[in-house]
Every structure is written in C-alpha cells, then in structure tokens.
Amino acid sequence: MAQNKRLIFKVNGLEKDYGSYQALKVKKLEIHPGTIYGIIGTVGSGKSTLLNILAGIDKESSGTVLYEDNPYETNWLGRIKVHDDIFFSKAPSFNRSGGTVEQYIAAKFNKKKNVIQNRYFKDGSFKNLWTRNMKEISVGEMNWLGMILACETDPRVLLIDDYGTYFNSNMEKDFRNKITGMNRTLGTTIILSAPSDIYIKHFASVLIYLDHGHIWKIRPGISKNRNPGQRNDKKKYTKGKNRNRKRNPRRK
C-alpha cells in the first residue's frame, strides 16, 4: 500500500461564521510542505479569515483543520495554542506591543537587533520608524514590519496576508527574493494572500482563488523555480448553486 504524502495543513468541511454571516466554506484543502501557495481574492473573499484559522489565531465554526495530522490544542480558557514554528505576518502581538519598534525587535531577536537595523532601518523612508511606538505606526508600516519579521524569523511555515499591497515594485522584488530564498534553501512552506495574482503568480507554485468564501479555482503558478518534490494542484470549480467541481489529476 502506498504511503500517504505528508501534509502541513489538511482542511475538511471548514466553515467559519460570524453570526448569520458565513465568511468561509471550504470543502477540502491540502497544503504540502516546502511549497509556495498564493491565495487570491478580493475584499470579502475569505482569504484573511482562512489565514487566521491556519495560523491558530481564529477557530473554525465547524469542520477540521489539522496541522501535521493534529488539531490545534486549546488552553483551559479555550484559547488556541499557537505553534512556535508558524509565523503570521499579521499576528495580534504586533498591535499589543506598547514599546518602540527597536524595543520589540530587541526583545524578539536579541543580538541580531543591530543587523536588522542596518539591513532595513539605516536609510530611506523607514529610518524614523525605528524609534516610533508600535501603536502609532500606520497599517502600511505595520505590514512592512510584518514582512521584515517574517523574513528574519526563519519559521517552518510562513503566512503573509495582503502581500504586496503596500509595496512599490522595488520593495516587492526585494521581499520576493527573500521569500523564494527561504523556500529554496530552507524548505519553508509559504502561504501568501493578495487581492490580485499580479505578483504572486510569478513565484508561487499553486494559486488558490477564493470568491465569497468558496474556492472556485486552483491552478499552478508560472514559477520556474519549483522544488522537484512539489505537487501542483490544478482544479477548476464551476459556479452555481451546487458548485459541482471537475477535478483534474494531480500533476507533479
């Protein structure tokens, strides 16, 4: 009997409701290790909700979400225990920090603080960000800071929401090189979301398109740097009441 391929995330019958509003309904989704995924969808498509659930920040209303074949554990208060080897670029801990950016990075990276300062905060428009309070920086600056921490933390699984939304072309190319380098040299599993595939399609192996909380299409990206072991799914979903799905065989 052939062995089942190891998965990072396995999602079955996932639903997420906020009162009477259903934000997400995903019948099945499998995330393979060492692969770069792009989740594409406009505002309200459910992409941020999906990342929050995968990160362990939010809990599904029904269905199962497994991380390496195990469900997320909760503490005695019912709060989800977040895995240390999963990094989410929009983790709530950023907003709860009351110190400066310098203090936050010093506490998180210790001796590596000076390296990070010279690498990202030495020149340019972000130089003054170093001494500002975390609670006072803008959404765009917080997004950029989350990207820096994502690249410097070296997690096993990296989740990035709203990739490229607040970047100019040079910033996007710089972070793209860092992300693909992590994937290529360290085997990091990376899941990024964006309202458009304009950037992500060039380096993601798998593109997942969401619409009103449903997956309606999955196709391979156009990346030329895929790992040999990556398996790319290409599935097309037809719209309609029953959302009948036609599945093509998996391709390596």
What are these regions (language model features)?
Residues 9, 24-26:
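Conserved structural motif at the start of ABC-family nucleotide-binding domains
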Residues 40-42:
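The feature captures the beta-strand-to-loop junction immediately N-terminal to the Walker
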Residues 55:
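Helix-to-loop junction immediately C-terminal to a conserved catalytic motif
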Residues 63-74, 82:
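Conserved ABC transporter NBD signature motif
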Residues 92, 97-112:
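Q-loop/switch helix immediately C-terminal to the Walker
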